[in-house]
């Protein structure tokens, strides 16, 4: 994973954690948790690709890795929709910028996970 993506994740997570969205703060905390989980999953897939011979290890450690991959893509789609919704309803420019960057990062991560998974298949 390149250092720009790492800093982007850290920056967006930090900024999202500072937002006060009133009654939707639980939803935002859920988004932050899923974002962080997605980052860890993407990192582990990337490491498996780097070791290429690790496919058998990945499969034995998690016999349902394709199912897990499918679940991660569903989480990404949900996060993308949630971020788009937040963009539509917020009028705060700080929040708009944060959610725009989060959306861009999600699209990049989706593409990276897709690339990693094709290399592992």
Curated annotation (Swiss-Prot):
Motif Nuclear export signal per UniProt: ranges: 12-21, 85-94
Protein's GO biological process: exit of virus from host cell nucleus through nuclear pore
InterPro entries the record matches: Flu_NS2 (IPR000968)
Main subcellular location of this protein, as a coarse class: virion
Pfam families xrefs: Flu_NS2
Subunit text: Interacts with protein M1. May interact with host nucleoporin RAB/HRB and exportin XPO1/CRM1.
Note: Average number present in a viral particle is estimated to be 130-200 molecules.
Function comment: Mediates the nuclear export of encapsidated genomic RNAs (ribonucleoproteins, RNPs). Acts as an adapter between viral RNPs complexes and the nuclear export machinery of the cell. Possesses no intrinsic RNA-binding activity, but includes a C-terminal M1-binding domain. This domain is believed to allow recognition of RNPs bound to the protein M1.
Protein name: Nuclear export protein
């Amino acid at each position: 994973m390149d250092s720009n993506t790492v800093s982007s994740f850290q920056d967006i997570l930090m900024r999202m954690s500072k937002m006060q969205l009133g009654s939707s703060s639980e939803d935002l905390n859920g988004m932050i948790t899923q974002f962080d989980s997605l980052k860890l999953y993407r990192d582990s897939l990337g490491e498996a690709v780097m070791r290429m011979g690790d496919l058998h290890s990945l499969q034995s450690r998690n016999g349902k890795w394709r199912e897990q991959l499918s679940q991660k893509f569903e989480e990404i789609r949900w996060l993308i929709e949630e971020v788009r919704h937040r963009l539509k309803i917020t009028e705060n420019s700080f929040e708009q910028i944060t959610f725009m960057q989060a959306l861009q990062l999600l699209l990049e991560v989706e593409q990276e996970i897709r690339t990693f998974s094709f290399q592992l298949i």
